[in-house]
């Protein structure tokens, strides 16, 4: 089950970005299973899906982990997005030096939205490199997200509510104006 408003989020934010001259792309970096994300109703909204996956046998049964994505492994995918090297088997180009002006998605143009502890390293890195990070909480317990603000892991903390007019919606729109 998705957070409220997720299914309409991508199209709406893309349209808003286009209205102010910002091309918006969405990527997901997840410790969850890629196959589950790819089978979801929102999969088509992502320019890239980076998640754990399996190797399958001839009967399409999972037989071995192909890719494991933990909290520290997530950061490499930010560099893949940054450099435009989305093929996870292409480590050579990923590790080659790329001048900042030739990077496809500069870090200051990134908005990282995280909803769990495995997102903390990515939120911190994006923030340190000039982008913005938003820590999400669900329910009324804001202790973790408040702490992320206090220790400079995130710029903003909001309810995991993607509906129009929500605090998250308004925060992302504001960040898109800064990027513009």
Specify the residue positions occupied by each region the protein language model found.
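C-terminal cap/substrate-recognition subdomain and adjoining C-terminal extension
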Residues: 3-180
